[in-house]
Amino acid sequence: MNVLLTNDDGVYAEGIFILASYLVSAGHRVVVSAPDRERSATGHAITISYPLRAYKIKLNIKGEIDVYKIDGTPADCVKLGVEKLAGFKPDIIISGINDGPNLGYDVLYSGTVSAAIEGWMMGYTSIAVSLNSNGQYHFKTGADFIVRLLNNFDFLSLDQKMLLNINIPDLPGEKINGIKITKLGKSLYEDSFEKRFDPMGKPYYWLTGNNVDNNIHDSTDIWAIKNNYISITPLKIDLTDLSQIDILNHNLNNL
């Protein structure tokens, strides 16, 4: 398959390097178009106020692969990669492997997931893949799973393009309990800003906070990861709340 690969951790991150290596070794044609630095939690931002620059670089990966670092966001990397850099029409766009999970409401902040959404909006089946990092960094577990997924699921025959959010436990493959098809859970935080001072005595603020442990149902991505399952969540981007339309029509009749 022709694979466009991106991430939000940056082009030199371990997760994208290992995934690219596995994909090339499995016989896939891969082009990497990724940010030149850390771009986590940038959401679906795109660059419109200044030009983007792309630099072709080398990564120590055996086999044919073109790698570009972009001074833009993950969504920028997908747009530019598809339109100008790849040299082929992608069969699939993959974003990851992210260092850290993207579960529940966090997908709305995630540059990793937003890059996949951008690919889907452009008409391509797209996958975001993240590792629930706990210090072990089993990126190879995630890379092996993605290769097996591409080998066993015929994405090319689908009438509708898919948008998938995949989270992988940070474990050796043999310790994973299986695969769960899930829905998004509710990941909520108690946010706080810590006030600090720079060497000039001027204040700045650092966002901190704690995860609020909600009721976690066994159908959610959060439950699956907590119980050492691979979570696969099909996503859509229509945010319309259909249940509110009649209420609004009724109450705004005389406005």
UniProtKB/Swiss-Prot annotation:
It holds the Pfam family SurE. GO terms for cellular component: cytoplasm. It is found in: Cytoplasm. A divalent metal cation binds at D8, D9, S40, N98. GO terms for molecular function: 3'-nucleotidase activity; 5'-nucleotidase activity; exopolyphosphatase activity; metal ion binding; nucleotide binding. SUPFAM superfamilies: SurE-like (SSF64167). It comes from the Bacteria. Nucleotidase that shows phosphatase activity on nucleoside 5'-monophosphates. This is 5'-nucleotidase SurE.
